Each structure stands twice: as C-alpha cells, then as structure tokens.
Amino acid sequence: MSAILQYDSVSKGTYSVKPKPTESLGNEFSEGLFVPLIGGKEPIEYVKLRENLCTKVLNELEEITTHTTYDSNARVLRQLCEHASEPVDETGLLRTAIVCDKSSNSMHLKFYEQLKDDMEKIGWKNFVVLNLKAHRDLKSCFRVIKGGSFGLGVLSYDIEKLDEKTVLVLEDVEDCDRRLLSSLVEALSSLVRHSKLQGCLYTIFNLKIPLEMFDTSLDSKFLSNVKTKVFNMKASTEILESLFTSIEESLSLKFGWRTRRFFRSMFYERSWSVERVIECIRYSILTHFYGNALSIIEHLIYQKDFHLISPLHLTTLRTVPSFQRHIEQRLEIGDLESINYVEKMLNDDTYFQEMVIQMCENLLYRERLLRTQAKIWHELEMAVKTTTRISFADYLETFLQGDWLSSPQYKSICQAILRMNSTKALACLDYLNENIFTGNQTMKCLEIHQELSELIRNSSTNYLEPVEVRMQNYSGTKHTRKVVESGFDKSIIDFSKILKKIVGLLDEEVQYGCLGTESIDMYPFYEVLFYDYCRPLNQAFASGHQRSVIHSSCMDPEYYVGDEKKIDSEFSNAEKDGKDLISWLPDLSILYKLYSESGALLNLYDWYIAFSEHLQAGKENLKEDDNHPRESPQGNLQRELNELDEDKRKLEEAKLQSRFLFGLEELRFLGLIKPTARKTDHVMKTIYHQ
C-alpha cells in the first residue's frame, strides 16, 4: 500500500471521490451519475459539459478498441472463415480449429463478437461458447450447448434435428477432464457422421498453453475423431501494445506515466485479458470526468472559450498541488520580481487566467515534444541494434517520468555506440545531428563528424573498429589489458576516443537540452490535463485494497477492535508479567495466522490441533499463577470430581470444535479457502499460495 499512497499527493485536492448526496442537489440530478462538485457549487451547465466530454471520450475509446482489435485479428478471422467454408470430406471426422498464441490469453470477447459476425455472413447462424472446466458430464455440456452459454446463439437440445450451421467454441480445454473432452469429441463426431448433419458443426478450441503441451495430454480416442488445423493468433500483449499506441495518438484524454505504467503492468505482470484492460481504461476515464471539476479546462482552452472559465474554476485552480509547488519555488527565489509575480497570480484573476492558458499550452507542447523524442530514440535503438529492446510505450513512460538519463535502455544505447565501426559511426552522427542535438551540441557534433572523417581518410583502411570490439573476448588483468591496448594502431585508439566524445555529447544533450531530467508532473496544472490518479484503479482492479484490509485486520486486530491505547497497555503489562494475550485474539485472527504459515493445501485436523494449542496456551499461563497448595480429595469425592472433569472436558472440546468450524466458515465467506474434491479432509487456499 505504501507504493500506492506515495502517489496520492499528485492529485490531492483535484479529485472529489465523495460528492454531495444526490437528494440535496435537486430533482435534475436525482437520477444522473454526474453531480456538482466544488462543494456542490459547480454550475449545472459545467456538470453537463463534464458528462458530455466523458461520453465523447468513451465513444472514442470504443472506436479505437474495435478498430485495433479487428485489425489485429483480421488474419485469423479470415483463415477461420475460409477453413469453415471448405467442402466436407468423406471421412466424417469432426472439423476442428485450434487457436493459440502461446500465452496465458488467447481469444477475447472482441474476437468472439467479430468471429460471430463474420461467420454469420458465410451462413453459420448459431454461435455457442462452452467452458469445459465448469462441467463434469456430457449431459450438462449439451444442456449449455442448447441455450448458448455466451448468449450469441441458440441450439436445439435434440442435436439430430439441427437445420442450421453451428460454431462451437470450447474454452479451458487445457484444464478440463480429459475423459470428458474425449467423450464430447466422440459424441459430436458420431453426430456429424449422420447424413443430415454433415458440415453443420464447426468446432474451435481456444488454447491457452503451447500446442506441444496440449498434444501430449491427448489420447488416441480424441485423435481418431477429429481433423484439426492450427491457427496462431497475435499475442494479447501485442494487441494491447497496438491499442495503447492508438490511444496515445487519438484519444482526447492524456494519461500520466503512473497510470500508463499501471495499465501496462496489468497485461505484462498479471497477464490480464484484453477486456479487463479495456475495462480499467474506461474506469479511469469515468473517474477523471466524474470526480474532477477541472477536467473541462483543456476543452475550453482548445475551443478558445476562455470566457467560460469562471472565477470558481480560477479559485479551484489555485488549490492544485502542482501550482502550489510552483508558487513555493518562486517564493524560495526571494527576489522582487518573484514576489510581484506571486502576488499577481494569487490576487489578479485576469492575469492568472492568462498564465493558466499559457502554462497549459506549454505543458501540451512539452508532451508532444517528449512523444516526438521518444519516437526518435526508439528508431535510434533499432539502428544501433542494442542487445535488449523495449516498446515505444516504455520509452514514452521513461521520458514523461524524466528518468531517461539514468535508464538502463539509455545506457544500452551508449554501450552500442561505443562498439560501432567507423561506417555506422558516421551514419549515427548524421542522424543525431538531424534529429536529437540542439544548440551548442549541433556545432560540436559537426566538429566530431569532421574529425572522424579526417581520421578515416588518414588511416590505412577505410574501416575502423574500436578497442571495445577488439578486446571483448579478452579475460586478462587490467594491467595486461593496458599493455595489449598500447600495441594497437593509433587510429584505432583515436577512433575509440571519438566514440566516447559522442556518448559524452549525448549526456549533455539529455541533461541540459530539450529533454531535461525533470518529470512532466512537475509542470503547473499537470493534474488538469493528465489523468494520473492510481488509487481508484488499484482499489478497483488490482485487488490490493480488499486483501490488504483483510490481511491487516486479521494480523493486527488491535487496530480494529477496542481502544488502541488500552490494548497497547495491556500488551505491555502482559509482556512484563511473562504472559501472552493469545486468549484475547479473535478466533479468525488465530486461524488466519496459521493460514498464512501453511502451504496451498491445509489439513483440517492439523489445523484444528494447532488452533487448540494456541487457545490452551493462555489458559496454561493462568494455571501457573495458581500456586496455592490444596488438599487432594479421596474416595467417592475423587470419583465425582473426575466425572465432573470429564464432562467439563467434553463440553470444552465441543465448544472448541464449534469455534474452529465457525472460524472456517468465516474464512470461506471471505473467499480465502475452498473445499477440494481430491482430499475431503483438506481445504485449498485461494490466495497467498506461496
């Protein structure tokens, strides 16, 4: 959670996550989603403008998503339609297409919709998606096939009475029961052998694992009933990279580097589906316009409607964290000019509005400049052929963050330049002088270019290699390395020095040129033009908020139950007396701590024994304090006491078992455990498997 909280200061004071209750806002907004912000003082026309802008951006996202996913899937869609349209052979085998991309995600919802539309155009009227992992027998499979689990088509329960062509997509085939898969394929194959049903069924396997792993798990009965053809889809990560490139170029709303990094981590680190990433992007757009009253400023500036920027907006703009930081920096200078500037910015609305427009335009220009520079450096990386390559989106994130000078990719480019030959070095200098170097660096680059050209003309050959290349396989000591290098021709040593000058000139350009090392969120009114608020996205999609609350409340219940100071004093007194407060802890807390220490499967009996031992520990401490001598009873009295102790022991054991079972039910209700069919005396963890 610390990684999330440290970013909240970026948008502090900009987003209102708890608007005024709708019942006090009038009838006009009693049914709408958007409500007046800024303490309920926002005019109604601005609320409607925020809603219209949000709808516009969401429609833009839908168009971009549809266009990008269709272009990415066009090849496979065309191949599947051609395969489904092929004439039926006389073997009577079930025609099957296996679609895979060797990743955790294969087909996605957009692909299903596009495939259904294309299949309908060529005569396949029904479209059914069947998740085999959720079924255990053929009857339940055919029941789902009848109704259409995806809701895109209806299939008659009596399959022999089919009169329309049907596309059947099988999901989770790698995780289902192999016997069920073989039986289903055998049943479908026997149906299509019927004279009336030949060519009426086309089966598609959605495979999420490499094809080689799937082949090894199949039996001869499966292979004898199908005629398969493999289609390799574009990986989900490639589709999402294309989607992000289109969003960056076309979407009206700009995303900051924090939200961009969160989006991309979803499909690289968590391997989420395409729909889940798009859903998160939609949620971020809605959050920006729903909770930010200043989200209309960019639209007003773009439309030149400066008169619509109200005094209420100007007052709110003065509370933006980036502007407050800008004012504090000017006050630290302390000269008369800075003091007058701050006074006019805080008191003169006309001057402040002019500066807001100018600063927002400068910020948008800065973003366009960084985007252009990211493309240039990305092309340079491909030209110098570095050992590792990253996507354009990674480049842009690094540039927006202002960390390009210290990034591993920049160092990799510099290392590649130090290993260039003379021909590539001349071409690299021409590219740098034309696209990257500015100001004094341009003149220095021309001087280096002239020096290198003269060195090549004076050398015995027109081809030079640096010392780094000639010594790359040398494994001697530093002293012997210097001795070997001293034996090289002078032109080679001078060429290596020229390459180092190029790298030094690049360092100067990155640090002091148009790029700089300052993050874009340091510019005033960054929060107004960019959405970079990660907390709602983490809480809604990363599942960190709910899990962290459950974890912290079970591990440290003293922060959630009773008076914290009183509990702290009780703990300190217990530590002084050599006792513990295990008996005070809730049963759920004790069970959860044992849960956290175990593996993926938990034996219920072992868990119960450990739970009872934890509860008995507190009672044993109390018994140790009772050291008063007592006379032992004799005769019938002893037998009666033994019977009472036995009844008491059974009663305590029954209470202990009930407490344990109640705690298990609480863990199940929270979604932390689930029963397993293989071992009835075990339960399985749903999270924290490691």
UniProtKB/Swiss-Prot annotation:
Molecular function (GO) terms for this protein are: DNA replication origin binding
Tell where it localizes: Nucleus
Recorded protein name is Origin recognition complex subunit 3
Write down any Gene Ontology CC term: nuclear pre-replicative complex
Gene Ontology biological-process annotations? DNA replication initiation
Q: Which UniProt keywords are present, listed alphabetically? A: DNA replication, DNA-binding, Nucleus
Provide the function of this protein: Component of the origin recognition complex (ORC) that binds origins of replication. It has a role in both chromosomal replication and mating type transcriptional silencing. ORC binds to multiple sites within the ars1 origin of DNA replication in an ATP-independent manner.
Output the Pfam families linked to this UniProt entry.
ORC3_N (PF07034), ORC_WH_C (PF18137)
Q: Which family does it belong to?
A: Belongs to the ORC3 family.
Oligomer and partners: ORC is composed of six subunits. ORC interacts with cdc18, recruiting it to the ars1 origin of replication.
